C-alpha cells in the first residue's frame, strides 16, 4: 500500500483508535484508550498511527524501560498494536512495527553507568519485548513474522478476585 502515511499519534486520534479497537474486540473501551493516549505525557511512549487519505487505519504504542527484572539493558516494549480489520493482512502492521523499531533504535533511557564527564549514558534499545495471549494465534504469527521468538522470561499471575 503505497499511499500509507506513518506519523506520530496525537490526542486528536483518540476517536479513531477507539473505533479500530471496537472493530477488533467488539466493545468500546474509550476510558481505557483515553488514559493511554491523552495521558501519555505522564509515562512517555513512542506511539504511531498509519493513515490513508487522512483516515487512521492502524496504531502502535510502545515504551522504553530498563533495569527491571534483572535486564541489564534498555528494553523497548510493544504495548499494543491495532489495525482496522478492513486493512489487516495488507502490510500495515509491518509498516507500523518497522517505524517503531526505528524510534526504539534512536531512543533509550538513562542507564546507571555515566560518561567520564558525569553525564548519564544514553543508549538506544537493544531488545524488544511484548506480551501476547496464548489464544491470539494471529498476533503470535505476526510477531513471529517480525522476527520475535520465545524469550527467557515467563509471565506469572495470581488471581486475587
What role is predicted for each listed range?
Residues 114-122, 128-139, 157-161:
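Conserved beta-strand-loop-alpha-helix junction that forms the acyl-donor binding cleft
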Residues 143-153:
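Conserved acetyl-CoA-binding loop of GNAT-fold acetyltransferases
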Residues 10, 84, 88, 133:
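Residue-level recognition of the GNAT/N-acetyltransferase active site
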Residues 11-12, 19-73, 79-80, 84:
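Acetyl-CoA-dependent GNAT
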Residues 3-17:
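A short beta-loop-alpha structural element at the N-terminal edge
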Residues 45, 109, 122-125:
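Short, high-confidence coil segments that cap the C-terminus of an alpha-helix
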